Amino acid sequence: MTTDEFKKPLERLLNAVVEKAVTEGLDLRRLRGVALYDSQKDSFIKALPEFAVVESGIKDLDQVRAQYGIEQSSRITLQLVYEYFARTNAISVDCALLEKLWADFVTELDIPVWRKRGVTNLRHFQLEDLHVDLGDGVSIHGRNPDVLASLGFQGEIWERLVADWSGFGASSHILVAESTIPKRPDNFITIDNGEVWLRCHRAIGAMRLIAPGEVGISTTFVQRVAHFNVGIGGVHSTGATVQTIGYPYTWPSEQRSLYDSTYAALAHLERIGYRKGPGNLDLALRAFMSTYDRFPFAVDTKLVDSITALEAMLGTESEIAFKLSFRVASLLASSDNQRAELLKAVKGFYDTRSRIVHGGRPGKKQNEYLAAVDDLRDMVRRLLGSFVLFAADDTRTVPKNFFAQDLDLVLVDAERRESLRRLLGLDASQPPRAPNTTSSMVSLIV
């Protein structure tokens, strides 16, 4: 049976459903739903002789066999009925409506991929534009019900998104991400494989690495977007809304290329691992993100997470406080005076961290460092952003174990230190950037 030949049996099934519903005095709600969610509703339709004819035709469609699997034929047949009555306000068969339903079914059948789309509220976020395409299926939109509806977010998702939009940091923008996977019988019921949330998380990570501000996302709501719902109901959600106090993040449009590079680098490192970077780059990234996302928010844990990120990148097993302070100051500072100031500052932050993790009560000096915790996180941002770009760039290399064994030897030599800072993109007071070099570090340490 071809797809065109299939319409007549479907029309006969719908007429049989109408006749039976009218005879039994059922209302329209009994004819709407999602297949396999209500066995009583399903049995009402499946008991009709016309149902078996349509199901048999579904099984014979080559695309159904290849993409959905013949075991889903009953579900799809039920959903054709439910979807039809979801589009009408009367218990009757409208030929024009049936044609539209059929066209949508065939269109979806011709599409070889499942499209998943997620939406989440952006928090502590400012942007003058109403739309920014970030690439890789990720985009920012101003909060607008019509725009959301055009993206497939209405009804339950819209209600949950509105309910989630509250408290400190609520903004007028949302983040949308989508991904696709090839249709196969083994992923027929998969609403989300995690890729949508991962793209949202990666986008936020890139934003945080290029500019200051407490930008974050709320719960991410994910659904399958399709011309025809093949019988998958419900909305999948992941993550949680963390209300934090902080200053807003203003989208730095002038650094769009840096965002693109950072996003691509994060994606690359997720695929290949983080071994090329200094220390434990994966842990450093997670600790840095925790300074934004940890709940309940507390300034002392924000400081501890920031120091953890520094230790993961540049820590050592002995003389930790001094060596960590020396390395951070040497990499970030561009003059002797700046190095001295940064060394003292990082040492003070580290001492404050030690007081906290050992259960001590902060004194006056420690409270001053706690009040300046955002300065510490800015240091982490510059280093981490630089190391992420470096670790993902195959044209920039250092000898094996360089960061573990030879870093300090380079940092005490002014010429080699500046060469290293240029290689890492740290030779400016601006956020990390990809340097214009393809050199190796070998010449710096021999």
Label each PLM-derived region with a short phrase.
Residues 1-68, 96-100, 253-332, 340-348:
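Amphipathic alpha-helical interface elements
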Residues 15, 53-301, 369-370, 378, ...:
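Charged, non-catalytic interaction/linker regions at domain boundaries
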Residues 306, 322-327, 362, 366-376:
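Composition- and surface-driven signal marking solvent-exposed, interaction-prone regions
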Residues 308-312, 355, 382:
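Residue-level signal for well-ordered alpha-helical scaffold segments within enzymatic catalytic domains
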Residues 315-318, 354-362, 385-393:
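Charged/polar positions within long, soluble alpha-helices
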Residues 320-334, 396-408:
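Short alpha-helical "patches" and their helix-cap loops
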Residues 340-368:
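Histidine-centered, metal-coordinating catalytic motifs and their short helical/loop contexts
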